[in-house]
């Protein structure tokens, strides 16, 4: 994803230009491990950031220091230990489903880079515990795909509602229409939508 090109493009929109000038350059990490990224997303589902971070760190600490956080090591973990780390029974199953998938399927970087967003979504959603929101976060922050708009993300909904001065949260169609001017860099635009939603002082 060419962030500089995206910023130059988005600055043509007056609302985005204001946000870019206020919040600066967005931060997108690169080269994250696919399995670890999705594992972290599952742990973080429906939890506050602080609580999820603690549980994730406890889960990682269960892996022997001489080993890597990989599918095979996760499958070796005792369910009772995972429960004591703070994972619900449902999430334990989701984590094991994910590990089992990666243990038996070769999701190689070179293959993923050639797949479309839709193909990746179709592939990952078959894993129980992975929904569209998790796929969108994976596409945005692990693969750095440039034009992702997570329709189900409340922060993005609130950001669009705030920018376009809507009285209610936008529908999927409204979000699509409002974001057309940001294509093909909606991933970067979303970074700013999250910022304006988090900024309690923003008007």
Q: What kind of feature is each model-predicted range?
A:
Residues 13-67:
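A positional/architectural concept
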Residues 32-35, 72-74, 113-115, 151-152, ...:
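Short acidic alpha-helix initiation/capping motifs at coil-to-helix transition points
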Residues 38-43, 99, 138, 189-193:
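Short alpha-helical scaffolding segments that buttress acidic/His motifs in well-ordered protein cores
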Residues 1-27, 113, 132-141, 145-203:
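C-terminal accessory module of base-excision DNA glycosylases/AP lyases that mediates lesion recognition
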Residues 28-36, 86-89, 179-186:
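Structural motif
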Residues 37-42, 58, 77-81, 119-123, ...:
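A general alpha-helix detector
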Residues 15, 48, 52-126, 181-183:
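Alpha-helical ds-nucleic-acid-binding substructure associated with the helix-hairpin-helix region
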